[in-house]
């Protein structure tokens, strides 16, 4: 799932989901009725018939996640899943990510350290082009957290 949603904006929400389900019907396990998926993502009935081009950024992100819920991938790769979302949608997305991590590998990039602490079993920090495993127990230490933030600041201004 991309931080900037990529969707067929000439379709409505219903058309997009139906099209996806039709072309992937052989691989979708235990499909639900369309409305069930929209309800799971808190997409209101009046929004389901709107063209995707008229959806807000947050609604487009919800549609991308809806497609992933239907596809049920074993590995879910997300780029900044909460970027540009309002507080309500961000909280919904965080709860969804928490529920989706059961039974699959979820990998996501984020600049929100508290989000990583809340949702991740393991945290890896990308600094100066190198990956470094961060022990979550160290993140309870305020000084260690400050060290990470300082390193990230240094890198972003370099």
Report residues per predicted region.
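Q-loop/switch helix immediately C-terminal to the Walker
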Residues: 9-25
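A short, surface-exposed alpha-helical micro-motif characterized by mixed small hydrophobic
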Residues: 116-118
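Catalytic Walker B motif of ABC-type/P-loop ATPase nucleotide-binding domains
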Residues: 76-80
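Helix N-cap at the start of a conserved alpha-helix in ABC-type nucleotide-binding domains
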Residues: 87-89
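Conserved H-loop
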Residues: 103-109
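Conserved ABC ATPase signature
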Residues: 51-58
């Amino acid at each position: 799932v991309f931080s900037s949603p990529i969707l067929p904006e000439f379709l409505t929400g219903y058309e997009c989901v139906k099209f996806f389900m039709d072309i992937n019907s052989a691989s979708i396990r235990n499909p639900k009725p369309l409305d069930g998926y929209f309800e799971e993502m808190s997409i209101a009935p009046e929004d389901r018939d709107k063209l995707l081009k008229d959806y807000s950024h947050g609604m487009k992100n919800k549609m991308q996640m809806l497609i992933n819920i239907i596809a049920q991938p074993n590995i879910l790769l997300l780029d900044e899943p909460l970027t540009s979302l309002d507080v309500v949608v961000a909280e919904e997305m965080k709860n969804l990510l928490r529920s989706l991590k059961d039974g699959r590998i979820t990998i996501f990039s984020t600049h929100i350290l508290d989000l990583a602490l809340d949702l991740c079993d393991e945290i890896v920090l990308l600094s100066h082009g190198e990956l470094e495993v961060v022990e979550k127990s160290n993140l309870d230490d305020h000084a260690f957290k400050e060290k990470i933030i300082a390193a990230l600041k240094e890198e972003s201004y370099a």
